[in-house]
């Protein structure tokens, strides 16, 4: 009987414990849920507090956020500006050096052109003097040879046609006529020497001719033309020495 009573008491305790757990479990769950949701409510309240503008003396205070300059962008802009300035300075230096080179090149070309023009002018003057001037040794030679070809005594001694040539070189080539220039009483004189021969075999003559500048006309007139023939014979083609003196 005592054992039955003890069993009843244990059963009653088990029932009481299970009922207590069933009653405490909803309360614990609700309490835990409240604890979990309470920070969210607090956060919402704080957010509402920060969002709501405050009123000071009837004016609504608003918060404005201004975004400052980005240091990276400022650094990039400064580097770009530095590179642009550097490029401009390099371009300026290159353009200056290029201008100096071009100026030096132009001066060099100008010097070369002037030198070429001076040489060309001197050559043209020499050619004109040799071909057309009355003081040219070649002109004097041509005129003297022409007078010898028409002179009767020269034709009879040498025969026709009479040919003229200059000094003989070592290689047997006939070079230009030899001439000498000198002045007498302020007047220029030119003396030439050349050789003639004709159809007569073994006949050769040496021609001596001299011209003097005419102060009135500026031309050169013959003073004399002599032809030396061996042995010790001279043919006077023209002699104006006494007339000019």
From Swiss-Prot:
It is a single-pass membrane protein. The keyword Transport applies. PANTHER family: MITOCHONDRIAL IMPORT INNER MEMBRANE TRANSLOCASE SUBUNIT TIM21 (PTHR13032:SF6). Component of the TIM23 complex. Component of the MITRAC (mitochondrial translation regulation assembly intermediate of cytochrome c oxidase complex) complex, the core components of this complex being COA3/MITRAC12 and COX14. Interacts with COA3 and MT-CO1/COX1. Residues 1-18 form a transit peptide. It comes from Rattus norvegicus. Participates in the translocation of transit peptide-containing proteins across the mitochondrial inner membrane. Also required for assembly of mitochondrial respiratory chain complex I and complex IV as component of the MITRAC (mitochondrial translation regulation assembly intermediate of cytochrome c oxidase complex) complex. Probably shuttles between the presequence translocase and respiratory-chain assembly intermediates in a process that promotes incorporation of early nuclear-encoded subunits into these complexes. It is found in: Mitochondrion membrane. One of its GO terms (biological process) is mitochondrial cytochrome c oxidase assembly. InterPro entries: Tim21, Tim21_IMS_sf. The keyword Transmembrane applies. Its main location: mitochondrion. Keywords: Membrane, Mitochondrion, Protein transport, Transit peptide, Translocation, Transmembrane, Transmembrane helix, Transport. It holds the Pfam family TIM21. This is Mitochondrial import inner membrane translocase subunit Tim21. Residues 64-97 are annotated as: Disordered. Residues 70-79 have a biased composition (Basic and acidic residues). The chain crosses the membrane at residues 108-128. Belongs to the TIM21 family. One of its GO terms (cellular component) is TIM23 mitochondrial import inner membrane translocase complex.
């Amino acid at each position: 009987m005592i054992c039955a009573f003890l069993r009843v008491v244990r059963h009653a305790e088990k029932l009481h414990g299970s009922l207590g757990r069933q009653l405490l479990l909803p309360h614990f769950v609700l309490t835990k849920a409240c604890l979990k949701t309470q920070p969210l409510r607090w956060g919402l309240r704080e957010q509402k507090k920060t969002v709501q503008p405050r009123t000071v003396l009837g004016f609504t205070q608003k918060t404005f956020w201004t975004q400052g300059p980005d240091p990276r962008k400022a650094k990039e802009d400064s580097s770009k500006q530095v590179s642009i300035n550097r490029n401009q300075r390099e371009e300026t230096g290159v353009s200056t050096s290029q201008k100096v080179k071009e100026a030096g090149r132009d001066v060099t070309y100008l010097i070369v052109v002037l030198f070429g023009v001076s040489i060309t002018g001197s050559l043209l003057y020499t050619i004109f003097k040799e071909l057309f001037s009355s003081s040219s040794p070649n002109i004097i030679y041509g005129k003297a040879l022409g007078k010898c070809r028409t002179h009767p005594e020269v034709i009879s001694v040498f025969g026709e046609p009479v040919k003229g040539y200059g000094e003989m070189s070592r290689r047997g080539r006939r070079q230009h006529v030899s001439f000498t220039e000198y002045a007498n009483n302020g007047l220029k004189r030119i003396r030439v020497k050349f050789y003639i021969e004709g159809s007569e075999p073994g006949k050769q003559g040496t021609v001596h001719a001299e011209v003097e500048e005419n102060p009135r006309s500026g031309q050169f007139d013959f003073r004399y033309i002599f032809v030396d023939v061996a042995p010790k014979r001279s043919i006077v083609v023209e002699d104006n020495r006494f007339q000019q003196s």
